[in-house]
Amino acid sequence: MKNILKNIALGAIVLTASAACADMLDTAPSNQISSGNMWTTPELAQKGMNGIYETFYNRKQSNGTQVRSENLDGLNKYGIEALGFCTDYYANNYPIQLLYSEAKRANDWLVTFEWKFCYTIVHASNDAIANLGKAGLDTPTYERFQSEAHFLRAWAYSRLNKFYQGVPLYLEPVTNENCTKVQSSAEEIWKTVIDDCTYCIDNEYFPDNTITNYIGRPSKGAAYALRGMAYMWMKEYSAAESDFEAVGRCGYDLWQGKYIDFFTPENEHSPEMIFAIQYDEESGYCDNIEQALGARDTYGGWTEVKPAADFVDYYENADGTKFDWSKVPGLEDWNNLTAKQRAVFFCRDGLNSSKALASQKSQAIKICGSDVFNRYYLDNGNEARIKAAYDNRDPRLKQTIVTPYEPVDCYTPNYNGDENMIGKALRWPLYKQGTSG
């Protein structure tokens, strides 16, 4: 990804002696790569392919994590992509409205962004497929680049089809003026996805996997996985099963170590990673997702994306039995209370005894009601009671979710003397940020 398109000098304009005056000047710009000469050398072809992948990257991370039109870029993990999590957006966060509000207009900024994002990949892939033959590449490189371009086009059309169920189909380079095709059916788009993936699978020069070589690029295993998902959408389940089995034969496999160790730099090239976007600590190649997921003491986050309560409840007890809130000591009346009334169990200690927390107490009572608060709140032990609900559960729970009152290490610039905050617990209602413990 680091070898992205950059402005480079291509040399001076050359005058040619010719009987036809119209061709006397080479008008290729000297300060940038034009579409006319993009695919003319192996070096430029490599840059052109890298440029397609660059489309996935969010170049606006410094804008913050709020889902606004000016912040959208790349894979859009704070918008549509975040809805692929099992998440609770807060009620007025824009993406969640896509799930419950009326049909969106074609010019809706979130809908428009996804359309533009996918078709940028489609048209860039079409350009590569049509012009790679002009670059003077050796056969193995040419065939690999062709397969990568076919895969990326299939990936983009697959995403478009999931969102829109049929879109205009372009398989060759076109000008803006000629982008006038009408909607193709969802079945036609899935057929294109399958055809492009089959091209990759049948190409002898396309690697089975990219676990150790061509890291971050697609492979036959990735093509089998993508084609299998297309078959699933078409309800051709036997074909899908066959493709998913082929993924394993390509060298991919499930992670066999501890769950928490999977998400470490030394294991980022695990055989379970089929086609993954990866980041680097180097400035410009990192990610800011911890700010979106974290609270105020995690780089000033707003917990924009939160795990859904139902998703967390799916984590079973350590012995494999189903988790039941009413079986937690002190929470026997859980099922008799509304969601808002249950907020009393998540309150911090000291709301009755600390005058400094008077406004926080009022905030809690406003949500759960004074009767419920007086009956269930423990001034000393409220935190321990709810914390116990997350003990003795599937160990992956605390490896995935920051559970209530579980201490974590945080950092936010200019707080706590600009030092790490060790053993920080998010207490609710919030009183003060920027301290350890």
Regions found by a protein language model. Name each.
Residues 1-19:
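Sec-dependent bacterial lipoprotein signal peptides
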Residues 22-148, 155-172, 176-180, 187-191, ...:
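Short acidic-aromatic linear motifs embedded in glycine-rich loops, typified by GG[WY][YF]DAGD(H)
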